């Protein structure tokens, strides 16, 4: 289940995000391909929204797409993201945004592997990563 909505003013977002995160997450920017640290990440764990911390993707669904951005064939739960039509730059794409805070994550395409056939192409700067061990420690504190 998605967590309670996070609402902040743009000034508040600017205070808590780096300039690059703000550009991508709040202004729908795109990082350069192959530039993000999570593109190369092979550890087991969970990818969370860099703005609000909501869990979005599992390392179990990450795959090598060759595009230069972290790619996943599925989300942890369909209520974690919202899909929006994006016709910017004279293209027809589907934008992926965090359902909790509305931040831009990337786009989803219909050219991914089985079992979904989807490729969630996500900006590395839009994500944080928690290893399986960090996730277990968080559960123990609850």
Curated annotation (Swiss-Prot):
Task: Kindly give the PANTHER family that the UniProt entry links to this protein.
Answer: METHIONINE SULFOXIDE REDUCTASE, METHIONINE-R-SULFOXIDE REDUCTASE B1
Q: What class of enzyme is it?
A: oxidoreductase
This entry's Gene Ontology molecular function terms read: peptide-methionine (R)-S-oxide reductase activity; zinc ion binding
Biological process according to GO: protein repair; response to oxidative stress
Q: Which residues form the MsrB domain?
A: 10-132
Q: Which reaction does it catalyse?
A: L-methionyl-[protein] + [thioredoxin]-disulfide + H2O = L-methionyl-(R)-S-oxide-[protein] + [thioredoxin]-dithiol
Q: Tell me where on the tree of life, at the top rank, the source sits.
A: Archaea
Q: What is this protein called?
A: Peptide methionine sulfoxide reductase MsrB
**Active site, per annotation:** 121 (nucleophile)
